[in-house]
């Protein structure tokens, strides 16, 4: 098993110059001091893993560089990881029903955006909750969510960083609401709230861009009701678009990387798993796979 030090040394650890303040390679003296203090206090408390600059700076940014609050957040995260089984979830959890779930709730990663981020697509408008409940449970869906987060952290982002030549810390999300009604939008937003809770508290500062496309009339009004539950920084990264979204997406995602169904030029052979199951990106390219190895799969195509 590869050591944490070897793993971190295998891909860039600095973001490009001019990235957001407080990111690796873009810190001032006060932020460096806070980073040093946080690491010292966590080491004194007995923590030995996940104390690298990138991780600690994410927790500090999430708490506006308040060391005490960042420490509390980190400690709560580590407690959750232990209780939820997060550290071993990639080995322990198998989502063999995913090919069936994908028919009623399409969720998938597909290539990268112009900043090198992995792009995650979620077709909420195609969700059929009645059929999904026959296949899986909410508990397993949440396990799947955490499994995917761990895959992003341990496989997708490192590979994307190697491909980009600099540290890639965040992902780009496209959530398609085509076909959804305003009456069911509230249940969709409820899911977003639950997913955001896990993201904000246990995977802070991982959202780069978040596009809600094909948003129905009145969706923005409904979304405002949920804003109080979301961190303001998170809200600033969310873009709500109607049916004329292609030009905005293409500003962020190269046409050759954007699936054709969303106005791009990327096509996937069904024999390779199709768009929903192929999982195409640097993390599946031998040139960018490091000592961690290729990302495991949570289901079998056989």
UniProtKB/Swiss-Prot annotation:
Q: Keywords assigned by UniProt?
A: Golgi apparatus, Membrane, Protein transport, Transport
Q: Which InterPro entries match?
A: CRAL-TRIO_dom, CRAL-TRIO_dom_sf, CRAL/TRIO_N_dom, CRAL/TRIO_N_dom_sf, PI/PC_transfer
Q: Which SMART domains match?
A: CRAL_TRIO_N, SEC14
Taken from the UniProt entry, a GO cellular component term is: Golgi membrane
Pfam families from the UniProt entry: CRAL_TRIO, CRAL_TRIO_N
| Protein topology in the membrane | Peripheral membrane protein
An example Gene Ontology molecular-function term: phosphatidylinositol transfer activity
User: Any idea where the CRAL-TRIO domain is?
Assistant: 97-270
Task: List each coiled-coil range.
Answer: none
Where does it live in the cell? Golgi apparatus membrane
| One GO BP | negative regulation of phosphatidylglycerol biosynthetic process
PROSITE patterns xrefs: CRAL_TRIO (PS50191)
Q: What does this protein do?
A: Required for transport of secretory proteins from the Golgi complex. Catalyzes the transfer of phosphatidylinositol and phosphatidylcholine between membranes in vitro.
The protein depicted here goes by the name: SEC14 cytosolic factor
What organism does the record attribute this protein to? Candida glabrata (strain ATCC 2001 / BCRC 20586 / JCM 3761 / NBRC 0622 / NRRL Y-65 / CBS 138) (Yeast)
Give the taxonomic lineage as stored in the record. Eukaryota, Fungi, Dikarya, Ascomycota, Saccharomycotina
């Amino acid at each position: 098993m590869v050591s944490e030090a070897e793993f971190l040394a295998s891909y860039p650890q600095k973001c490009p110059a001019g990235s957001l303040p407080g990111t690796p390679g873009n810190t001032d003296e006060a932020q460096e001091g806070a980073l040093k203090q946080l690491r010292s206090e966590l080491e004194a408390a007995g923590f030995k893993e996940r104390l690298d600059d990138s991780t600690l700076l994410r927790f500090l940014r999430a708490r506006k560089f308040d060391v005490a609050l960042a420490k509390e957040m980190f400690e709560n995260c580590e407690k959750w990881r232990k209780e939820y089984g997060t550290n071993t979830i990639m080995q322990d959890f198998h989502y063999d029903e995913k090919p069936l779930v994908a028919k009623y709730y399409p969720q998938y990663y597909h290539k990268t955006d112009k900043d090198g981020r992995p792009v995650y697509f979620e077709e909420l408008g195609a969700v059929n909750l009645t059929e999904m409940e026959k296949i899986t449970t909410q508990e397993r869906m949440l396990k799947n969510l955490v499994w995917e987060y761990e895959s992003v952290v341990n496989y997708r982002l490192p590979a994307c960083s190697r491909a980009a030549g600099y540290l890639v810390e965040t992902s780009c999300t496209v959530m398609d609401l085509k076909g959804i009604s305003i009456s069911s939008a509230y249940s969709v937003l409820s899911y977003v709230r639950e997913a955001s809770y896990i993201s904000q508290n246990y995977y802070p500062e991982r959202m780069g861009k978040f596009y809600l496309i094909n948003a129905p009339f009145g969706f923005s009004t409904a979304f405002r009701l949920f804003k109080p539950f979301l961190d303001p920084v998170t809200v600033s990264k969310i873009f709500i678009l109607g049916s004329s979204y292609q030009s905005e997406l293409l500003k962020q995602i190269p046409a050759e990387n954007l699936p054709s169904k969303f106005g791009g030029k990327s096509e996937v052979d069904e024999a390779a798993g199709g768009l929903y199951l192929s999982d195409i990106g640097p993390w599946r390219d031998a040139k960018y796979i490091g000592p961690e190895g290729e990302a495991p799969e949570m289901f079998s195509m056989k």
